[in-house]
UniProtKB/Swiss-Prot annotation:
Xref: PANTHER family: DNA-DIRECTED RNA POLYMERASE I SUBUNIT 2 (PTHR20856)
Protein family per UniProt: Belongs to the RNA polymerase beta chain family.
Protein name, as recorded: DNA-directed RNA polymerase subunit beta
Quaternary structure, from the entry: The RNAP catalytic core consists of 2 alpha, 1 beta, 1 beta' and 1 omega subunit. When a sigma factor is associated with the core the holoenzyme is formed, which can initiate transcription.
InterPro entries (alphabetical): DNA-dir_RNA_pol_bsu_ext_1_sf, DNA-dir_RNA_pol_bsu_external_1, DNA-dir_RNA_pol_su2, DNA-dir_RNAP_su2_dom, DNA-dir_RNAP_su2_hyb_sf, RNA_pol_bsu_bac, RNA_pol_bsu_CS, RNA_pol_bsu_protrusion
UniProt keyword annotation of Lipid metabolism present: no
Gene transcribed to yield this protein: rpoB
Organism: Polaromonas sp. (strain JS666 / ATCC BAA-500)
Keyword Nucleotidyltransferase: yes
Length: 1370
């Protein structure tokens, strides 16, 4: 097994017993692939497939004018290179986007020589037209919109197609099941079919008024005869003078009650009247050769005629199809000489007369009348002209412009109606409508099953690409309308395509979607995990989806098909539970947008290496074993019965029936849930909290890897993009805190390309949640790297692994009530060592605008401020970087012109004498808000085009250019060094014709000569060999070309920086100041483990008072043991035991290093540690240096991986504890025989506690619910407009609500005065509170309570009900 550069440094010991057959796929694949397919930027225009932007253009074009003589055709589109890169867009507040330019042709046909069949081209104009800007996806799968990072969440919506369901008996009081069907297109009108309680079948379009379904059937060209022929089988009768002969069909008779004596040919009574006809009776009739049965007259009465009956002589219709037979009608038929009669066969059980009843309720006569009825329903009040009626009906279901079933919809439709072919037209056909009605009638007859709408085979995912394409289509559709109207003018006027196309509608549609759609969300950037999870989220909400209020329990519930596709654990608590889900670890989307999950093929009980991805629909056909099924050494399933899933049910089956097997035990959960060790031992509710709270962990100053992990930490850190990985292999040439320079391997460098990769690290960058994004290099000069190796850690990562919290020594015991109700007791040492100190970065913005009274100005010259208050501002009025600021300090000086005030003559005189202008402006400087303090870490100044830059802005630009020049110099240095190395190899030992320093002709060039000559003069050497000379010339040209390209790059950068900035309307200058705030852990901060065990810090206790162990080690955290049993999250206890072993093993390795043990001894110990259980590690492949470096990294604790559902057993934990704490160490630490508990001592008294305590290491996180952000006190603040009561909440500087229950409490205590002031002067007694303020100012303490405003509001509300109420003052 080959280890990457970073993995070698610290190998995580895994307890997983199952070999990994499939590595975890790239976690942002879904987002990236979807958007790549949408843009198709890397494909040549001719090779683009019809999807994404290409499909949108092909759908909108060609546009033909109303007269048909002008046409606009689409040829291809191109994407321009974005003007600014991602970082520049973030700092400047721009959108990272690319301009779309479409090449279109305007074709004008010749009116005179064109005919309706063939048109003659008069002229063709081709031009590239700007078609708006499309936001580009960053490497991390997010978008930068107006300077902020956003994520487009994928939407889980009901797939297009046809669905059959029933109301579960809820609609009608009798509990009768009312069946319905719905045809849902991707775009267009919905078509519903539904039964009413009287068994009449109706249809409705777009949920409008319902109409009998036979109207629709007539509208598609069926007459009553063909309708009945499609839905019924017929009974045949031959009329006699009295009664009739009925054709005998055995299966129709069986189970019926005979209404008359049934006789065979010979006249023998086989079934007596009122007896049920059984199989024996029908067999007897068949054996006697009976083909017809005599039936009495009344048996015919009430039957329904199947076809029109026409008098052969007169041509008159005697009976219409669907007429009921009566005695009178039978008489008529006999008189007309009709002998053969066909009637509908119906029964109560499985052949209902539903369509026949519906036909009777339908009064339309023919196809046109039916279409008119539909027109009236769709357009009530409009006159139904023939053209309008036909056009509307065509538009509803048959026009590809207005109706699109989509590939998915057609595939699902065909599959549901039982067709083998998955392709077909994208519009409805008459056969489709008929097929749906047939299946619905079959369902009502008791045949077939209704669909489960929560099945993931009926719900598909709409990704970023698809959502963006839909928006682009809407924009193009708006353009199409406008262009169509203007195309006619192109014949008379010399117009070009760009005169006709206005790209604003496209830009507006995309802007609205990316900026304001419910699915475009502000990226959760608290830590790397929250970023990944946000991008892998699947939401059922959003446009075209569900709403929180309407979503029932079934939609939110875990469904059997979620297995391996959607995580059953990770979902928000609260109103969105179950509506927002997370994609499972190995899941992916297929071409139709259905979620697939991988399985291993099993052939004859033997596991193969073939991996198939199955969607929820396909999975139902197979028997699938779990990943933990027992296998022998050859990979064959053992045991008589194997636990498996078949059709969504858990079953035990024989090994020979298994067709597939899960690829990994972790395949059912999401990334966040798979990071919880011992997840299998936690209750589901707590696991949900644990998975969710990891996303809220604040990145701390020094991240520390978790002792107990699951093995997914590395994958999630690398895929999140927070760490820096090597793009190509090579050698580290230079490292400092801000950049890493790598000289690329020759094999990986492209011909004629700079073989240098420069990685500029992010330093103290603000995230969306104000946390700190900061990268630290983890490589040294000379390190050899391979592609994909981690070279720098980011926020919350430690040597390339996700590290969300800190490992804390935890003791489970009560401590003086300070850990009552999940409170957490923490040692002062944790705070002193800055273990949970985090940096938060706040962005403060000030803008200088152009006002009516004149321009605002950013300046140091501010009225009424002392020099002391201005001493940290530079001459431009902007604070220095590095200044430490307190609440109220000025960050940026700004003055605003004041309105002219009328001056007294004396003031005018003084003003004339002293030239006093200061009173014309007022101070509107940017100051540090209350409750925040910190260090200024960055300042950015943006100036509008045409306004002179101040010194500070110029200095910022110069610094940026200096940094850029440094990068280019580094690249040039390496390129030149590389080139001169190659020249030296090329010339050494070659014969020269002459050269610098009077090199004689025929002399051999050696290294000594080359060292003596200045390197740049090597090009003047004239080698005798022409081949060598040409190579030397090409190297020289390549170097000059590189130098020239670098100069161009520098110029471009300078141009970008010196051009004016795009600022909002009316803004002349904008300054952004970034403050770094250090937040130490304090009481009130929320902390949590990974098992849903959360709590608030109640007290920070001096180290000496904390409980300590026999060897004097004090605990870091004391948790309440009562938090475990009722919560049923036992995983935390197992984590603590294994963490305790991890620490002990690290200490043993540390002791060995201190004792300077031989490498062989270290290898032997590591082999015992890594390879006695779980996954075997290839330690023999590591060099001695690697082993020593790894040992040094392990001294703080050996990291373990206990994969989800395949983790460490109790036995494994015990083995590790024994290895970590041999008897002598265990005794010194006061551990029990099992090493899971220790004897602790009270830090305050030194007394031994009564019994042993569970002690160990737990990975504890500090969550983003910090007391500093929540603490708030109101003095005098804003009031609500209507009730005049103080507002609520910190953001509004609101008060604390003294509610109903609090009033009861004061009433109970009889505190009448307190109650009075609470309800009046402290709340909404306007006069009263003003008087209180006045009296406090005067130093008095009198209260005169008046009428609360809310009472007046109540009086007004009662009056609004028409009740006259007034307050009579006595």
């Amino acid at each position: 097994m080959a280890y990457s550069y970073t993995e070698r440094k610290r190998i995580r010991k895994s307890f997983g017993n199952r070999e990994s057959v499939l590595t975890v796929p790239y976690l942002l694949q879904m987002q990236k692939d979807a958007y790549t397919a949408f843009l198709q930027a890397d494909r040549a225009p001719q090779k683009r497939t019809v999807e994404g932007l290409q499909a949108a253009f092909e759908n909108a074009f060609p546009i033909v004018s109303h007269n048909g003589f002008v046409e606009m055709k689409f040829i291809e589109y191109n994407l321009a290179k974005p003007a600014f890169d991602v970082r520049e867009c973030q700092t400047r507040g721009l959108t990272f986007a690319s301009a779309v330019r479409a090449k279109v042709q305007l074709i004008i046909y010749d009116r005179e020589s064109s005919t309706s069949q063939s048109k003659v081209v008069k002229e063709v104009k081709e031009q590239e037209v700007y078609m708006g800007e499309v936001p580009l996806m960053t490497d991390k799968g997010s978008f930068v919109i107006n300077g902020t990072e956003r994520v487009i969440v994928s939407q889980l919506h009901r797939s297009p197609g046809v669905f059959f369901e029933h109301d579960k008996g809820k609609t009608h009081s009798s509990g009768k099941l009312l069946f319905s069907a719905r045809i849902i297109p991707y775009r267009g009108s919905w078509l519903d079919f539904e039964f009413d309680p009287k068994d009449v079948l109706y249809f409705r379009v777009d949920r409008r008024r319902k109409m009998p379904v036979t109207i629709l059937l007539k509208a598609i060209g069926l007459n009553p005869e063909s309708i009945l022929a499609n839905f019924f089988v017929f009974d045949h009768f031959r009329l006699m003078d009295s009664g009739a002969q009925m054709e005998f069909v055995a299966e129709r008779m069986r189970g019926e009650v005979a209404r008359f004596d049934i006789t065979d040919k010979s006249g023998k009574v086989v079934v007596a009247k009122d007896k049920r006809i059984t199989v024996r009776h029908t067999r007897e009739l068949e054996q006697s050769g009976t083909t017809t049965i005599s039936v009495p007259e009344d048996f015919l009465v009430g039957r329904v005629v199947a076809k029109n009956i026409v008098d052969a002589e007169t041509g008159e219709i005697i009976a219409k199809a669907n007429d009921e037979l009566t005695e009178l009608l039978l008489k008529k038929l006999r008189l007309a000489g009709v002998q053969d009669l066909q009637v509908l066969y119906t029964n109560e059980l499985d052949q209902g007369a539903y369509i026949s009843q519906t036909l009777r309720a339908d009064e339309t006569a023919d196809e046109f009348a039916a279409r008119v009825a539909i027109y009236r329903m769709m357009r009530p009040g409009e006159p139904p002209t023939e053209d309008a009626v036909q056009a509307l009906f065509q538009r509803l279901f048959y026009n590809p412009d207005t109706y699109d079933l989509s590939k998915v919809g057609r595939m699902k439709f065909n599959a549901r109606v039982g067709r083998d072919d998955s392709t077909g037209p994208m519009v409805m056909t008459n056969e489709d409508i008929l097929a749906v009605v047939k299946i619905l009638v079959d369902l009502r007859n008791g045949n077939g099953e209704v669909d489960d709408i929560d099945h993931l085979g009926n719900r598909r995912v709409r990704c970023v690409g698809e959502l963006a394409e839909n928006q682009y289509r809407t924009g193009l559709a708006r353009i199409e309308k406008a262009v169509k109207e203007r195309l006619g003018q192109a014949e008379q006027e010399p117009l070009m395509p760009h005169d006709l196309i206005n790209s604003k509608p496209i830009s507006a549609a995309l802007k609205e979607f990316f900026g304001a759609s419910q699915l475009s969300q502000f990226m959760d950037q608290t830590n790397p995990l929250s970023e990944i999870t946000h991008k892998r989220r699947v939401s059922a909400l959003g446009p075209g989806g569900l709403t929180r209020e309407r979503a029932g329990f079934e939609v939110r519930d875990v469904h059997v098909t979620h297995y391996g596709r959607v995580c059953p654990i990770e979902t928000p608590e609260g109103p969105n539970i179950g509506l927002i889900n997370s994609l499972a670890l190995y899941a992916r989307l297929n071409e139709y947008g259905f979620i697939e999950t991988p399985y291993r093929r099993v052939v004859d009980s033997k596991i193969t290496d073939q991996i198939d991805y199955l969607s929820a629909i396909e999975e139902g056909k197979y028997v699938i074993a779990q990943a933990n099924a027992l296998l022998d050494d050859s990979g064959t399933l053992t045991g008589d019965l194997v636990s498996a899933r078949e059709n969504g049910e858990s079953v035990l089956v024989g090994a020979e029936r298994i067709q597939y097997m899960d690829v990994s035990p972790a395949q059912i959960v999401s990334v966040a849930a798979s990071l919880v060790p011992f997840l299998e031992h936690d209750d589901a509710n707590r696991a949900l909290m644990g998975a969710n709270m990891q996303r809220q962990a604040v990145p701390v100053l020094r991240p520390e890897k978790a002792f107990v992990g699951t093995g997914i930490e590395r994958v999630s850190a690398v895929d999140s993009g927070t760490v820096v990985t090597a793009n190509r292999g090579g050698v580290v040439d230079y490292v400092d805190a801000t950049r890493i320079v790598v000289r690329v391997n020759d094999a990986e460098a492209l011909a004629g390309e700079v073989g240098v990769d420069i990685y500029n690290l992010i330093k103290y960058q603000r995230s969306n949640q104000n946390t700190n994004i900061h990268q630290r290099p983890i490589v040294k000069i000379g390190d050899k790297l391979a592609k994909g190796d981690v070279i720098a850690d980011g926020a919350s990562t430690d040597i390339g692994e996700l590290a969300l919290g800190q490992n804390m020594l935890v003791a489970f015991m009560p401590w003086n009530g300070y850990n009552f109700e999940d409170s957490i007791l923490i040692s002062e040492r944790v705070v002193a060592e800055d273990r949970y100190t985090s940096i938060h970065i706040e962005e403060l913005v000030v803008m200088a605008r152009d006002t009516k009274l004149g321009s605002e100005e950013i300046t140091r010259d501010i009225p009424n401020l002392s020099e002391q208050q201005l001493n940290r501002l530079d001459e431009s009025g902007i604070i220095y970087v590095g200044a430490e600021v307190q609440p109220g300090d000025t960050l940026v000086g700004k003055v605003t012109p004041k309105g002219e005030t009328t001056l007294t003559p004396e003031e005018k005189l003084l003003r004339a004498i002293f030239g006093e202008k200061a009173s014309d402006v007022k101070d509107t400087s940017l100051r540090v808000s209350q409750g925040s303090q910190g260090t200024v870490i960055d300042v950015q100044v943006f100036t509008r085009e045409g306004i002179v830059r101040d010194k500070r802005a110029q200095q910022i630009i110069d610094d940026e250019l200096k940094r850029f020049r440094l990068d280019l110099n580094d690249q040039l240095r390496i390129v030149e060094a590389d080139a001169f190395d190659r020249i030296e190899k090329l010339l050494n030992g070659k014969v020269a014709n002459g050269g610098p320093k009077k090199l004689a002709k025929g002399t051999k060039i050696d290294k000594a000569y080359l060292a003596d000559v200045e390197k740049y003069h090597w090009f003047d050497i004239r080698p005798a060999d022409d081949e060598v000379a040409s190579q030397l010339e090409s190297i020289k040209n390549a170097m000059e070309q590189t130098r020239h390209s670098f100069d161009l790059a520098f110029e471009e950068k300078r141009k970008k920086l010196t051009q004016g900035d795009e600022l909002p309307a009316g803004v002349l200058k904008m300054v952004k100041v970034y403050l770094a705030v250090k937040r130490r852990l304090q009481p009130g901060d929320k902390m949590a483990g990974r098992h849903g065990n959360k709590g608030v810090v109640s007290k920070i206790v001096p180290v000496e008072d904390m409980p300590y162990m026999a060897d004097g080690t004090p605990c870091d955290i004391v948790l309440n043991p009562l938090g475990v049993p009722s919560r049923m999250n036992v995983g935390q206890v197992l984590e603590v035991h294994l963490g305790w072993a991890a620490k002990g093993l690290g200490q043993r390795i540390g002791d060995m290093l201190q004792a300077e043990a031989k490498v062989a001894e270290l290898r032997k110990f590591m082999d015992t540690l890594y390879n006695k259980s779980g996954r075997v590690e290839d330690l023999a492949n590591l060099s001695d240096t690697d082993v020593l470096e790894m040992a040094r990294n392990l001294t703080t604790g050996v990291p373990f991986a206990t994969p989800v559902f395949d983790g460490a057993s109790e036995e494994d934990i015990m083995t590790m504890l024994k290895l970590a704490y041999p008897d002598d160490i265990a005794k010194a630490k006061g551990l029990t025989a099992t090493r899971t508990q220790a004897q602790l001592y009270d830090g305050r008294t030194g007394d031994q506690f009564e019994r042993t305590t569970t002690v160990g290491y737990m990975h504890v996180l500090k969550l983003h619910h910090l007391v500093d952000d929540k603490m708030h006190a109101r003095s005098t603040g804003p009031y609500s407009l209507v009730t005049q009561q103080p507002l609520g909440g910190k953001a509004q500087f609101g008060g604390q609500r003294f509610g109903e229950m609090e009033v009861w409490a004061l009433e109970a205590y009889g505190a009448s005065y307190t109650l009075q002031e609470m309800l009046t002067v402290k709340s909404d007694d306007v006069q009263g509170r003003t008087k209180v303020y006045e009296s406090i100012v005067k130093g008095e303490h009198a209260i005169t309570a008046g009428m609360p405003e809310s009472f007046n509001v109540l009086v007004k509300e009662i009056r609004s009900l028409g009740i006259d109420i007034e307050l009579e003052r006595s």
